[in-house]
Amino acid sequence: MKEEPKQKAAAPGLVYFHIPLPEFSSFTSSNFTGVKQEGISSPSINSGFFASMVEAGDVKAAFIGHDHVNDFSGKLNGIQLCYAGGFGYHAYGKAGWSRRARVVSVQLEKSDGGEWRGVKSIKTWKRLDDPHLTTIDSEVLWNRGSNGMTFSCRVCMTVNP
């Protein structure tokens, strides 16, 4: 049996939970992508969970739900904080605002010999539940540079398939 190669560095972490952290209130309309159409329903007590994610150093993005007509994403202390947007029809929404789901895509590197390597990039976008299943707000959350260094950037655009 062939021994698997050891992981050289921590993989970029992605965190998923339902209730937004108080830090989601840190954004203004000038420093996020997407829309904020209702208040942030976070706990009144800050548990320190966000500070723990920052301290861990490997968490690149956190994804939450709860506030169904918010779908924004913004970066705070090196971590992209992303609302999922309301998708289901079993809960509240906003008339005229298409239901949407946030998609997260993680691309892995492959060696010349076809072996899987580390994570190459993490991207996200939202898919609307409209007649065209429109893709909006595409962003690169994280990627590995050609020199092995990591960097993050934001690219915001609307793409129709």
Protein language model regions, located:
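His/acidic metal-ligating clusters that form di-metal
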Residues: 1-71
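Binuclear metal-dependent phosphoesterase catalytic core
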Residues: 34-41, 47-56, 70-161
